[in-house]
Amino acid sequence: MAGEADGRFKGLLVPILLPEKCYDQLFVQWDLLHVPCLKILLSKGLGLGIVAGSLLVKLPQVFKLLGAKSAEGLSLQSVMLELVALTGTVVYSITNNFPFSSWGEALFLTLQTVAICFLVMHYRGETVKGVAFLACYAMVLLALLSPLTPLAVVTLLQASNVPAVVVGKLLQAATNYRNGHTGQLSAITVFMLFGGSLARIFTSVQETGDPLMAGVFVVSSLCNGLIAAQVLFYWNAKAPHKQKKEQ
């Protein structure tokens, strides 16, 4: 029975969270302070946690838009630039065969960001434009994932993530500052993005060793931190028309 239980436990960890040599090091030899293997376990665990959490990260934002039937306070340009950055990460990671645990959340965030882009257009009375956007985006994504796309183009797209993230977040920050409130921006989504990007700095260094990936997450953390700070600063601020209704 003990052997069966050990086998099941090993099956849960190897190779999802640990390579076999690290499993032996930690759970057979009981060398629980083996730093390299502990780093792998922490990185894989964090990575899979981030991927699982990403399924829900932007849903509060989607539901807030649907509930309010308004995209007030959201910068479409900012959301679009975030989509460019996420798409670059997905394509670059697939092309380089990085472990799914090191980038999987980008795929789920991409799908949710596409939905937000469409909803922003829809609630601005541009539904046809939104449908056209969905079709165009699907074609561009298929083209980028095609073997015909040169690696240099994919690398350039990933390198463009840094300016895309910076400009996109600054546009949203400027919109918040100009409005004096954060409108329909979801605080839950903002804080989850901030926490996820911080954790990704460690996991990207540990799992991919790619300085470009790590650099993108460092910049993303700084920019997400700025938006999170604005959410806290404008926590009790409301749009002028809402203030009038309350009066």
Curated annotation (Swiss-Prot):
Annotated PQ-loop domain residues: 39-105, 159-216
Record keywords: Acetylation, Membrane, Repeat, Transmembrane, Transmembrane helix, Transport
Compartment(s) of residence: Membrane
Domain of life: Eukaryota
Topology with respect to the bilayer: Multi-pass membrane protein
Modified residues (N-acetylalanine): A2
Record-annotated membrane-spanning stretches: 37-57, 74-94, 100-120, 128-145, 151-171, 185-205, 213-233
Reported function: Required for normal utilization of mannose-dolichol phosphate (Dol-P-Man) in the synthesis of N-linked and O-linked oligosaccharides and GPI anchors.
PANTHER family: MANNOSE-P-DOLICHOL UTILIZATION DEFECT 1 LEC35 -RELATED, MANNOSE-P-DOLICHOL UTILIZATION DEFECT 1 PROTEIN
Protein name (database record): Mannose-P-dolichol utilization defect 1 protein
The gene coding this protein: Mpdu1
